[in-house]
Each structure stands twice: as structure tokens, then as C-alpha cells.
Amino acid sequence: MQIPSKLKPYYENIAFEQEDSKMIINLGPQHPSAHGNLRLILELDGEQVVKARPCIGYMHRGMEKMAENMIYQEFIPTTDRMDYIAASANNYAYCAAVEKLCGLEIPRRAAVIRMILLELNRITSHLLWLATHALDIGAMSVFLYCFREREYVLDLIEKYCGARLTHSSMRIGGVMLDLPENYLEEMLAFCDKFPNDLKDYEDLLDDNRIWRLRTENVGVVTKEQALNWGCTGVMLRGSGIKYDIRKEEPYLLYNEVEFGVPYATQGDSYARYKVYMQEFRESLKILRQCAMLYKDTSPEILATHPEYVSASKEQILTQNYSLMQHFVLITQGLKPPKGEVYVPTESPKGELGFFIHSDGTGRPYRLKARTPSYWHCAFFEEMLVGTYLADVVAIMGNVNIVLGEIDR
């Protein structure tokens, strides 16, 4: 039985001339190069794309609505499932928004640990991007080498929080644990080893004729386009705009560490690749400085504020007031004052921010996530026009989107 509906199929909304040279094809939603459930409706004239329409929603889970029915602490693990390649970035952006709403200031050691987790996660995210992007173009060796190095970083993250992908390592007011014994030594050993691995990647790709042909003058994004479409991160910096939220609006202790903001002016896929490669090196600089900062901090890893943050386990087990306050926080949630905040952060893919409107209860009245992949995916509508079908997959891989944060 056919269900009557006024909604037309996607392809009927795309007007095109009925010519022999024109055709419409679907790329996805089940396609290995889509890196998720993304559907692109492409109108082709021969092999050239004349219209493109990204269709999303296949992974939609209603996360923003879920947040309205959870206490503030309860939503932290859900943020892991947005950009699941960079879970710590999501954890931090959400916790920072709640902390700003509550007026919480986290201890210095907690800030350093957060920075370490964020930069390690940035490296794993960039490694996965390089591995899959190279594989899409046919560079199998780079894929294997990137995954080899990524294992070292995932082992470091796992040693801290017990998880490799969905970390849930941060808490409102600080972090879950102090760094384990010998953690900094292992991290610094990786920082010493990794530059040689980066050189291996560049030796394989920089002078590779196929890699250059598939990335140079492909997927060109001008400054005006990047700004008009809300591009951030490497998509913006690869087009000549030197903008990094860690520099422009410093958070945690980024204003105390020295690092550069890599950028390029060509705006093509190869320029963005070079920016990514330099960002690896800047993250290593930050990690080395964090190791020095950590040694000069006191051992507190959670803010002291009974209204918003639970006491230590020892206090909960020995003090009636701490036990009662902990019970209230776990069952009813912390209750920020009425108001609204937006906190932007620099995730591996661009600007990741959370807007929260509080009505004074233990649950957000409204939560909105600003995720970079959503804006970059929308840009395909203009970015892919004029390119060849063979380059579509290469451009999609270069833009570095993840469907988990598009379909929230």
C-alpha cells in the first residue's frame, strides 16, 4: 500500500535539462569513501559536476533534545558520540560551557591535563584524516604507517582514562584523574619519535606525482568562500586566513605556551594537507611545554565548589555533609544560575562550540552544538561544482568531515 505524501524525492527537487549528456547519480549513503552515512546527489555533464546536493540525517540521534532530559553531568558521555574521532574535544567544549555558566574556575593542574588530552586527541584525529585521505587516493602505505603511529597515541589516552575512542575523561570542574606514574616520560618519548615518522609521510607524499596531481588545484576554496560558508579550522587557514581560537580567544593555558598557527594561501587540497602536517609539529611543541607546566602545579584536579562539584571520595565516605551534597548532585544535577552562554573552542576540524540556555534547573532548557563538519558539509553544494567526478572522493576526504557531528 502506498502511503500518500506531499514530499517529493530529492531528485525531483533538482531541476536540470533533459539532455543526453546530463545524468544524476547518488554517491552514498553507503559508500566507503563517504566515511559515514552521507549521500551526495550529483548532477553530471559528462564527468563534470554541475550541481551537488548533500543529504544528511541518516545518523541523526536527537542529541540536543536528549540534553534537555539529562542532568548536566549525564550528558558528558553523549558528547563523545558526536565527533567520535576527537572525543576529548567534545568533552572539553561542553564542560567549558557549563563551567562558564556556573562561574567555575578549574585548578591549574586540571587545565594542563586537559591540554594534554586535547593535543593528543588532535594528533590522533589528524592521523586518521591523513590515513583515510591517502587511502582514498590510493596511497596504501601511508594508511598503514599512520595507523601504526596512531596506536602509540591511543595507548597513551587509554593509559589515562581506560578508553581509546570515547573517553568521557573530563568532569565539570576539572578532570577525572591525575596523570599515572611515568605518563609524561612516555608522552615525551613519543614526542621525540614522531617527527621522524612525519618526515616519512612527507617523503612518501610531497614529491609523489600522483598525490600532487590529485591534490594541487583541486578543491580550491577562496577566502571569500571560506568566510561566506562559515568555514573554520584548516579549511579557513588553508585559504590564507590565519585564525585559531586558541590564539584569538585563549582558553585553559594556551596563552602560556608558544606555538604557531600554520596557514597557506593557495586554498587547494594540497595546501590544506601542508597545514595539517605542520599542525602535527605545533601539537608536539604544546605537549612538551605542558610537561613542564605540569611539574609546577599543585595536585588538585577538581574545583572546590560543593554546589557544583562533588567532594573527594574520602570526604564523601567520612563527612555527612559531603555525602548529602554528592547525593543531590548525582540525583538532581548541578543547578547553574539562569542565563545563557556560548563557548567556542578549536577542535581538530574547526570551531566547536556549545550554546546553553539555563532556566536554573538541573537540566539545560536548550542546548545547541556548533560543529565544524556541519558547515563544511553544506559547502559541498558550491565546492564540488565544476570538479570532475573522479575528484569528488578526493575532495570529500580532504575536507575532513565526520558524520557523527553532522547528524547530531
UniProtKB/Swiss-Prot annotation:
Any one GO cellular component localisation term in the record: plasma membrane
* Catalytic activity, as annotated: a quinone + NADH + 5 H(+)(in) = a quinol + NAD(+) + 4 H(+)(out)
**EC class of the enzyme, as a word:** translocase
| GO molecular function annotations of the record | NAD binding; NADH:ubiquinone reductase (non-electrogenic) activity; quinone binding
Kindly indicate whether the keyword Phosphoprotein belongs to this entry: no
Which family does the record assign? Belongs to the complex I 49 kDa subunit family.
Q: What is this protein called?
A: NADH-quinone oxidoreductase subunit D
Q: What is the lineage of its organism?
A: Bacteria, Pseudomonadati, Campylobacterota, Epsilonproteobacteria, Campylobacterales
Q: Which gene encodes it?
A: nuoD
